[in-house]
Regions:
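Short, basic, glycine/proline-bearing loop/turn elements
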Residues: 77-81
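Non-cysteine beta-strand/loop elements that form the S-adenosyl-L-methionine
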Residues: 102-110
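Aromatic/hydrophobic pocket-lining residues that form π-stacking "cages" and hydrophobic walls in ligand
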Residues: 20, 132, 156
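Divalent metal-binding pocket/active-site signature
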Residues: 1-74, 86, 94-95, 99, ...
Length: 162
């Protein structure tokens, strides 16, 4: 749901999101949520599904600590962190201090939001290592440990314990 440029089709976006959630539950698939200037709207759509097996990722999360904590209310939702965390004025390093490492995934928003030191270039998957290094520093872990936790949990629920 994207309300950054235009709120004209909010009702339609909400109906489509409801349908996608219905399909996700029916087929046991995750939802990937694009949330831009629309957190409260998405949260209100998700709230009735809180006690269901719905799972997903808040892709390209750039929200507040409060919003991140509200996402944590949904046991099977992850927060997608990309190059924004490396930006000088990013608030994500502070936000992440309240979020368990096990609840984030590293991602790109390619071709956008290229992490420092490549900011200004077209983003690509190879640059996720820069996001990884930044996140490792925030959590006080090695990049290898962060890679293991954030990658394995995407595919299996108990991989971080290995």
């Amino acid at each position: 749901m994207d309300l950054y440029w235009d709120k004209t089709f909010l009702r339609e976006q909400q109906r489509v999101l409801d349908k996608q959630i219905e399909w996700a539950l029916e087929y046991g698939l995750p939802v990937v949520l694009h949330c831009r200037e629309a957190f409260d709207h998405i949260y209100n759509v998700l709230k009735p599904y809180q006690q269901t097996p719905l799972k997903g990722i808040f892709h390209s999360f750039t929200g507040t600590s409060e919003e991140a904590c509200r996402i944590m209310e949904f046991a099977d939702f992850m927060i997608g962190i990309n190059g924004v965390v490396t930006f000088k004025k990013s608030t994500l390093p502070e936000v992440l201090k309240n979020i368990p490492l096990e609840r984030i995934v590293l991602e790109t928003d390619s071709p956008y939001l290229t992490p420092v030191p490549n900011r200004g270039k077209r983003n690509e998957s190879a640059y996720v290592k820069d996001t990884l290094v930044k996140v490792a520093g925030i959590y006080g872990n090695s990049p290898e440990k962060v890679a293991q936790v954030t990658s394995c949990l995407l595919y299996t629920s108990d991989a971080a314990d290995e």
